[in-house]
Amino acid sequence: MNLIFCGMPGIGKTECVKFFSQYVPGNERVITIEDTMEIRYSVTNPGKDCIEMRVNDRFDYADAIKASLRLNPKWIMLSEARSKEVKYLLEGWSTGVRGMTTLHTDDVRNIPDRILNMLETRVDADRLENDIYQAMDVGVLIRKKKNGAGQVYRYIDPVSYTHLT
């Protein structure tokens, strides 16, 4: 199952990825790809099969996603989909690899359009539009509110299933 957690910056999307990652079976290889090590899969899930990749100027998200597919993963977790790397993530997910990622949008229904806008060219967008709906199983919107006492709480608002199988 591929999950995309969305919401505004600082809302707790990565924390949700960390929470749901504990339900990945321990014998399934997970590859995390991040620029800032936030998921810390090996810390939050000790003893599970994990390879943590850190991207930089010489080893970008596209390189990491391509390299990860050679390592026989069951899961690819991208800390945040921001730009053209989403193309490679979708291609990876289309091979049957499962995954989780986060992205910034204020409505779960905007996930497909947000992904299309991240792609470099209109040709990529046209070619990958169906892949988005095939690859994404669940979209989750995270919100936060303050209660009367001024305490902040976070909650999951709508959940969207793109297809049921």
Model-derived segments and spans:
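Hydrophobic positions on the alpha1 helix immediately C-terminal to the Walker A/P-loop
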Residues: 16
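Conserved P-loop NTPase nucleotide-binding/switch module
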Residues: 72-133, 141
